[in-house]
Amino acid sequence: MDAFFFPAFQGEFRLLLGSKRSEMSPVASRGGITNLWRHEEARPTKFLGLLEFHRFRQKMGHKWPSEAKKAQKNIKMNHVRLERARRLLCSLGACIRDAVVKERNKGKRNFANVAGVTPADTIYRVDRISEAAILSWFDEKWPFSWPVELVYEGIEGEPGMTFPRGTPTSKTMFKCIIDPIDGTRNLMHDKRSAWVLSGLAPQKGSATHLGDIAVAVMTEIPTSRQWRSDQLSAILGGGPRGVVATAVDVRFPARRTRPVTIVPTSATNCLHGFASLVRFFPEGKILTSKIEERLWDELYRSKARPLVPVFEDQNITTGGQLYGLMAGHDCMIGDIRPLVFAKLRNASARSLVCHPYDICTGLILTESGGVLEAPDGRPLCEPLDTTTPVAWVGYANGALARQIRPALRRAIREVLG
């Protein structure tokens, strides 16, 4: 009777009325305290009996099913759910990567054709390939019981895209922000890897922000000369052990994954290492260079060291920058373009900055032991959209953050006011 009566709701009710030893505790992230909870002990429990069901109805004020469904929607993400979400986003990233690689292997040479222009960015044909893969994947793979709103460049001027299709945004449980291809120009010129970036957060409407992201995955789209594609993922509160790094050989149809080791540098200074402030475009180069010069002068220049051996690497993808910090390649990377362009009063350069979808995998860096914050040290709390400018600084470890942060603040204040 019990098994017949409640199979569809069994898993959800266990979180509410399951084992007495199932404790819930808040989880903090560098993006601020996030309103998520981890299920610290999950063990088999029996199916809910009729008495327990009626008790639940009493809690809901006898308003089944509408109130019960609302309660089901508001149940916080536990560890099992987080891991499931991780696997789903890893599958999504692999799907987009494979679609782009397959199209490239056909010998197509029109990746650089402009397909459209949005407030967030210019959309190229290669972006449309990835977007088609996204929609197909969500139709086929995303759990029907997890209604989700999608946010990615190309649809910001359209009504909210949700899955299952047609679900009102107000009825969704999650918000998934995606950068289908971070580094489109890298792929167009076959210059450097691009990345598929995705982050999942509990739905809070327009209040959902970067600090709410609970699962993040980044998947490498390699150049035509490169056989290996890395994929990194993390869940909130998992720490370094919860960061999963794998690689596949994209030359063969069988995508066999193998673990790889990705560790941030343990350096305590930037000498003889890589550290950069972003300046991809002519706009703002002079101001950014002044800030950087003052920074290194204060930290490292002296009579005994008239030349400062700190190198820079202008990787034009935010995903690639984060990967550099996580993989031990870089000590510090800062993207202060929104501050510089504001000083220049250059409104037309608004699209030439980092946006939330670019930095949505910052959780992987912080769970790896790195630091990600605003230039003034605040947590990143920009809304999960495709147009809000984001200024950020990433450090490979806490020691580097403590050394560089005060000097960087002073340099920014002296140059930009």
Segments (PLM) and residue ranges:
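An extended, acidic
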Residues: 89, 93-96, 100, 167, ...
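Aromatic (phenylalanine/tyrosine) cluster motif
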Residues: 4-9, 13, 47, 53-56
